[in-house]
């Protein structure tokens, strides 16, 4: 495949086995004005929509793909690689998205991790008897974070939670 101004397309997702690709190929992508690719074509995000956000756009596309896939054969297994850019720098998030999680992480990531584990067990996402894995030893325990640094860490968790992962992962 010939090289283009945006690189050799033989290394793009569609040539690595993905039937459909929508997203960005470069790092540190703007969530407001991204450079997008759909399969092998460059596509433009809407320029006149002040509510546009790449993470919403990617989630909409992922869910539409899932609906189409399930309509074709609901029993057929699938693999969707959903990797929104919003959870990586630069963190472009609408304040209202993050603010709705204000205070939800004030007890820290260890407590949150335990809650998620218990919720996954209750929902049947993980089988009964599954043990919570030990915290990564390179990750500090919440108790070891100095009090004056905790508000910053709490805000980072609020920002991260403000993205669309819940809408994508809770789709039935």
Predicted regions span which residues?
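Formylglycine-dependent
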Residues: 2-102, 107, 137-162
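Alpha-helical "lid/cap" subdomains adjacent to substrate-binding clefts that gate access
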Residues: 105-135
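Conserved small/polar residues in nucleotide/adenosyl-binding loops
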Residues: 168-172
């Amino acid at each position: 495949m010939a090289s283009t101004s945006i690189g050799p397309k033989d290394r793009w997702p569609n040539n690595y086995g993905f039937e459909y690709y929508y997203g960005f190929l470069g790092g540190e992508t703007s969530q407001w004005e991204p450079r997008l690719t759909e399969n092998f074509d460059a596509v433009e995000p809407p320029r006149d929509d002040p509510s546009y956000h790449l993470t919403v756009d990617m989630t909409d596309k992922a869910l539409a793909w899932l609906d189409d896939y399930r309509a074709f054969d609901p029993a057929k297994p699938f693999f969707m690689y959903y990797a929104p850019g919003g959870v990586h720098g630069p963190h472009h998030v609408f304040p209202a998205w993050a603010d709705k999680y204000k205070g939800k992480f004030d007890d820290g990531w260890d407590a949150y991790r335990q809650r998620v584990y218990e919720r996954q067990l209750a929902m049947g996402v993980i089988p009964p008897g599954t043990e919570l894995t030990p915290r990564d030893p390179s990750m500090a325990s919440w108790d070891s974070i100095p009090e004056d640094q905790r508000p910053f860490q709490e805000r980072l968790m609020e920002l991260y939670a403000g993205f669309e992962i819940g809408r994508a992962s809770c789709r039935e």
